[in-house]
């Protein structure tokens, strides 16, 4: 055996296997998901990621430099503009997806099809939506062992607040009744 390599038992490796049939979607992992155009199902596969839901279930909890989620939504639905302090990669599995970035008149967009890939740099405001005609799935990967939280435009936070959601000091979702 080479120096620096490990041997793992099957039981040890099975803690690092996520079966699609066992995954349960989280429809309120982010503050924007209560807004109709941003409804989506999120599946945290590897690592907690940047979830604003402290009770978010994760399939594989060992995190070694990245977090991965599956994203599913109906046509026209997706995620609001937001930013991360780390890189974010999007890979469509099914359907067509619009990945858009920058705010206002500086806005740009690219349409991705299955197995295309885009890597959005840290700090760039980005969003996405299903640009196809059927429910579609995409993989999202956020870099870093500690992916921190999302930065949202003030308009999105205000609209979410109007639905009864807000973020606490740690960046976790609170219902209005729990926040008061």
Protein language model features and the residues they cover:
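A short, N-terminal "cap"/entry segment at the start of jelly-roll beta-barrel domains
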Residues: 1-65, 168-180
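Conserved short histidine dyad/triad with adjacent acidic residue
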Residues: 50-55, 67-84
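A generic "binding-loop/recognition-motif" signal
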Residues: 75-77, 85-86, 124-125, 134
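Double-stranded beta-helix
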Residues: 2-15, 127-180
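Short acidic-glycine-tyrosine-enriched beta hairpin
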Residues: 103-121
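Short histidine-centered beta-strand/loop micro-motifs
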Residues: 57-61, 79-84, 101, 109-111, ...
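Histidine-centered metal-chelating micro-motifs
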Residues: 78-80, 98, 117-118, 122-127
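Glycine- and acidic-residue-biased ligand/ion/polar-headgroup-sensing regions
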Residues: 85-98, 103
């Amino acid at each position: 055996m080479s120096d620096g390599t490990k041997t793992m038992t099957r039981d040890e490796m099975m803690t690092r296997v996520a079966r699609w049939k066992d995954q349960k979607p989280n429809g309120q992992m982010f503050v924007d998901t209560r807004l109709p155009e941003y409804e989506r199902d999120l599946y945290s596969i590897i690592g907690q990621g940047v979830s604003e839901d402290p009770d978010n279930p994760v399939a594989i909890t060992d995190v070694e430099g990245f977090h991965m989620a599956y994203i599913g939504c109906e046509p026209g639905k997706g995620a609001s503009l937001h930013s991360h302090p780390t890189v974010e990669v999007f890979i469509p599995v099914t359907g067509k997806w619009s990945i858009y970035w920058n705010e206002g008149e500086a806005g740009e967009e690219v349409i991705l099809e299955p197995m295309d890939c885009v890597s959005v740099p840290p700090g760039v405001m980005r969003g996405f939506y299903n640009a196809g005609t059927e429910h579609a799935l995409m993989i999202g990967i956020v870099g870093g062992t500690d992916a921190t939280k999302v930065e949202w435009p003030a308009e999105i936070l205000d609209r979410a607040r109007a639905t009864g959601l807000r973020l606490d000091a740690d960046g976790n979702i609170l219902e209005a009744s729990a926040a008061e």
